Amino acid sequence: MNPNQPPNYPPGNPNQPPPFPPTPYYPMYQAGMPMPYIPQSPQYPQPGPPGGPPPFMGIQIKQEPMWSQENRYGMQAGPSGMPGMPPSSHPYGYPPMHGMPPGMPQGMPPMMDPNMPDFSSPPMHHPTTSLLAQHLSSAPLPPAPPQQQSHLSQLLQQPTTYSTATNPHAAPTQTIARRPDNEARNAQLQEQELAARQQQQQEYMLQQHQQQQQNRAGQLQAEQAFANPPTVSIPPQTGHPPQQTSASSQQRAQETMAQQTEPQSHIRESPQKETNLEKYSTGELCLYGRELVNDLNVKTSYLSTILKKVMERKPLNQGENPNDLADQCKNALQRMSDIRQIIEKRREPTWKRMTGEDYIELMLDDSELKKPMDEERQKRRAELEQRFAIVISKTPPVEGHIWYQGKWISEELHKKYMQFEANKEIVKNLAAELKALAWKIDVTSPGHLKKVDQTKISKKKTDDQV
């Protein structure tokens, strides 16, 4: 007899269910319900250290035969507590017993008296299930967490109030319990668009204000430029800068050369404001005209360079526009013409323009004059002395005038010339002293000293110690 074959079954193949008994003999062994009198398999020693695990850890449960896991006599296989098996439709997880009438209920009858205690047995587990699975199946479930409403549902449940504070003649406020999602979304989008438009308008107003301030500053600078003569730019040198005695001097020379040789990317424009030139004196108009001449020289040179690039079909740099530059040159010429007309109108009616012959006659010395002079030359010489008495006359044309640099000038103007010469000498001496100080600083700078070799010093110390 096979040891895995239950003793209360007739002998046969252990992998196949036994045939149905001919007599009303029902087995005492039900599937999944081992009886206490069935002998268990012998216990074998378990591997491990001496002493071994606790007794309950080494218990081996006898496995059921293969045929007991399948359908037997039309019953479903296994109890509901077996891991990996679907729950059974029978009460308590076991199939109905054999020999019972078909109309009799298979489960325990329900308790009729609610006051009676519950004597129902706990759920049975399959012998092969682990202790953890049995504990988890018998443990109570944790309480369910409270369900929180979503943020969207809370927003939809809030009442929406429409206020008419901006319109005093409107009807009183109305409270609506809920508003559709698309209406709320549209209102939010409209508010965002309105805020964006207001921000753009504020930025545009700020830009306009800054532009007006810049234009006003340029106009004021142009109006003040009349009293300040412009500085004439030094033409670029073709040679290399002279060698200096220090690295800083060479660096300054290189920076100066780079500034002189690089093209002028920003051209100073003439004032575009239509100012009234009549209110300025003749001297101020002359200074303004000199500034326009210097500006025109730079712009015409730059314009010729751009036109050459255009003719050679070379790409222009950013900001190079020959049309704008030509318009600026044209405006400068027109302004110079206006200044010339104003100065000409202020001259005396008897004034005549000096010709080339008149200028040569004025520059001649007495030793260069042919004597005796003819009548025509004497008449011409007398006319020039009358017109340019401050240059040709041997005596002061006005009492108190002083001869200075080939012409007669007033005493006040002579004092100003003297003060200017004194200040010029002071500035020259100060510039020379500053240059000498800079040269001393460059020469005596410790950065130009030779570096000390530490290895030689350490070697010398060791030699001295030895």
Swiss-Prot record:
Superkingdom classification of source: Eukaryota
Source organism: Caenorhabditis elegans
Chain residue ranges for the region called Disordered: 1-25, 136-277
Protein name per its UniProtKB record: Glutamine/asparagine-rich protein mdt-30
Polar residues bias locations: 160-176, 230-242
Subunit structure, interactors included: Interacts with mdt-28.
Biased composition, class Basic and acidic residues, residue ranges: 265-277
Biased composition (Low complexity): 147-159, 185-224, 243-254
Coiled coil: none
Gene that this polypeptide is encoded by: mdt-30
